[in-house]
Amino acid sequence: MITATELLTIDAVLQELDRARRNGPLQHIVIPPCPELLTRLQKAMSEAEPDLNEVARIATSDVAMSATLLRAANSPAYSAGGAAVQTIGQAMNRLGLQRTAAVMTAFLARGAMKVTAPQLQRFWERSTKRAVAMSHLAERLPGISADLAHTYGLFCHVGMPVMAQSVKGYLGTMVEASARIDRSYVQTENANHRTDHAVVGALVSRLWRLAPSVTAAIRLHHDLEALGERSADPDVNALVSVGLLAEWLMRRHEALDPDADWVVHGATAMGWLHINEDDLNTWFEELQEAFDAV
């Protein structure tokens, strides 16, 4: 794989993924197909004026997904003490179209990638927390799409369950990578398997036709040397930076120390976004209820 400083454009990332899929270590990675309902949802949401009836039809085509939407709409974060919603239409009105699509995307992704390994026990819980935090932050920062931020937060580490399902010995690698202090998590993954969860996750994003900026951000979320580069794609830099903030906020909520990426690159991310510690503390307080609800 080429270095992060050579992947300053989205096109460079996409070309690297395509080469690795054709001739490199990604040839034998089994990527779950994108769920048909998610493909339909993506098509509906890509229209200049999305068809609300089509989104509702997709939602009601799966009983469990309908129940998930109703539960989200009736959660403290959205109900504000109001009467409980009882129909998908009511839930969509309360949540709004973008949040409705985000809840549906999370449900469908979770169904497509079953996680049974104990090493990944809280995978979807933490992915959902990250997505919630990122959309919250994006709404408070200029020029960042809350929809893209939520999608990136949800899929950021999706390479892990994919590798756990299709790469022999990967669960052992996860244990080793978490324990080692002499090299990073992705360095251990690459030493053992010639690829890592950031690359595999980016491939999932590409094959599932997520936004190119999301694909590039997933690919680069642990290769942070280019984070402060002016020539790097600003949308990708913004997503990766907000992702670092979200991870810091999550770990603080879980009473954990900041991770290594934050220790080294947190100040750069804050500088890129033009924020300070007071902003972080304010957002931490704002997110408590949302984190507890996940």
PLM segments and residue spans:
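C-terminal appended segment following the main domain
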Residues: 243-294
